[in-house]
Amino acid sequence: YGIHCNTLL
């Protein structure tokens, strides 16, 4: 959660 470039995946 939010670990890859501010993604919510």
From Swiss-Prot:
Q: What class of enzyme is it?
A: transferase
Q: Which reaction does it catalyse?
A: D-sedoheptulose 7-phosphate + D-glyceraldehyde 3-phosphate = D-erythrose 4-phosphate + beta-D-fructose 6-phosphate
EC identifiers of the protein: 2.2.1.2
User: Which pathway or pathways does this protein act in?
Assistant: Carbohydrate degradation; pentose phosphate pathway; D-glyceraldehyde 3-phosphate and beta-D-fructose 6-phosphate from D-ribose 5-phosphate and D-xylulose 5-phosphate (non-oxidative stage): step 2/3
The UniProt entry's GO biological process terms, in alphabetical order, are:
pentose-phosphate shunt
Task: Select a single GO molecular function from the record's annotations and give it.
Answer: transaldolase activity
Ordered alphabetically, the record's keywords are: Pentose shunt, Schiff base, Transferase
**Quaternary assembly:** Homodimer.
Member of which family?
A: Belongs to the transaldolase family. Type 1 subfamily.
What's its job?
Answer: Transaldolase is important for the balance of metabolites in the pentose-phosphate pathway.
Instruction: Name it.
Output: Transaldolase-3
Q: Could you tell me which species this protein originates from? A: Cyberlindnera jadinii
